[in-house]
Regions:
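Cleavable N-terminal export/targeting peptides
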Residues: 1-28
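Short glycine/proline- and aromatic-enriched beta-strand/turn motifs that initiate or cap beta-hairpins
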Residues: 22-70, 210, 284-291, 295-298
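Residues on the lipid-exposed face of transmembrane beta-strands in outer-membrane beta-barrel proteins
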Residues: 33-37, 61-69, 83-85, 134-140, ...
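Short, proline-centered helix/strand-breaking motifs
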Residues: 17, 128-139
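Extended, basic/helix-rich recognition subdomains
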Residues: 215, 222-224, 231-252
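Outer-envelope beta-barrel architecture signal
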Residues: 25-33, 73-79, 130-132, 146-152, ...
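Extracellular/periplasm-exposed beta-strand and loop segments of Gram-negative cell-envelope proteins
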Residues: 40-56, 88-130, 161-214, 246-289
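Short acidic (Asp/Glu) patches
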Residues: 117-121, 134-136, 142
């Protein structure tokens, strides 16, 4: 968060220093309609479950509003603020993973407590996440000639969650129960307590627990091309370094219980699969993206 504060102070400091020197004839405004396409994996994540991995694709579609507050001999400084919708598709994979926990009487058709064992084979989840993002950034631009210029961007991006759902679940799990009170009797018959092999696509599943607010540092470089007197096109590459986590970690390193296990069972609800985002200790969206924009200057 200190990095965010320093960048914001720099942005406003530069504007304050130069605004007094601006010439009214050099004031220029811009409206920028843009689309960003994520390149490669867009999420950096960690989990205490070593076999849990994630990858994400992201995009962004929005409008930015720019104000050129200083220009001289082809150089310019521009302050920008925007609003965009930024969807993300996050895929989580839990590879071969075994665990057990103490199952209560509510997890047995005969009301017995026992030790429940799971052997998971490649549990896959896809999470759909939507955010409204507000980029605030400073642009330094240099116009090389009458129709072509280069620029660099530096700023921050704030994100606000709009929706988060698990849109897809697949995989298999084998489960069985051991009953210590019956001389460690092992039961894996499917007619009792959903033991045996289960297709997880048919199980119930939870909802990702997200942070409502996220921040990232924005940097970028690009080129702007003039189409007409007021209209231009921009192609740039941007990198957003996530500062805050997208998801709230719910379980961290403790032994599994009926409440915290990735898959659990009760007689009333059947097999229930938790969102794998519950087990992410770090989940920062950090996309490298290609940005294409249409710019109207006036």
């Amino acid at each position: 968060m200190k990095a965010i504060k320093y960048i914001v102070l720099i942005l406003f400091g530069v504007i304050s220093i130069n605004v007094c020197a601006q010439n009214n004839n050099s004031e220029r405004f811009a409206i920028k309609a843009s689309a960003e396409i994520g390149l490669g994996n867009s999420i950096s994540s960690n989990s205490y479950i070593s076999s849990l991995s994630s990858k994400a694709t992201t995009g962004s579609y929005g409008l930015d509003f720019g104000w050129t507050f200083w220009s001289q001999k082809g150089h310019r400084l521009e302050a920008n603020i925007g609003v965009a919708y930024s969807p993300a598709a996050i895929e989580l994979e839990l590879g071969s993973f075994d665990y057990n926990y103490g199952a209560p009487a509510t997890a047995d058709m005969d009301g017995e407590s026992y030790q429940r064992y799971y052997e998971i084979s490649n549990l896959h989840q896809k999470v759909s996440l939507g955010r409204v993002t507000l980029p605030i950034y400073l642009t330094y631009g240099y116009k090389c000639n009458g129709w072509f210029g280069l620029h660099a961007d530096l700023g921050v991006r704030f994100g606000f969650k709009t929706n988060a759902t698990i849109s897809e679940v697949s995989g298999e799990a084998y489960s069985y129960g051991i009953y210590p009170q019956y001389d460690n009797l092992l039961i894996d018959e499917s007619y009792l307590n959903d033991f045996g092999t289960t297709n997880l696509a048919n199980a119930g599943y939870g909802t990702p627990v997200c942070n409502g607010f996220s921040t990232s540092v924005l940097v970028g470089v690009g080129a702007e091309f003039s189409i007409s007197k007021h209209l231009g096109a921009d192609i740039s590459v941007r990198y957003n370094r996530g500062i805050t986590n997208l998801f709230k970690e719910q379980y961290s390193g403790q032994d599994f219980t009926n409440a915290s296990a990735p898959i659990n069972y009760s007689v009333s609800d059947g097999q229930q699969v938790k969102s794998l985002t519950d087990y992410l200790s770090s989940s920062k969206v950090s996309p490298l993206s290609l940005r294409i924009a249409l710019i109207y200057r006036f």
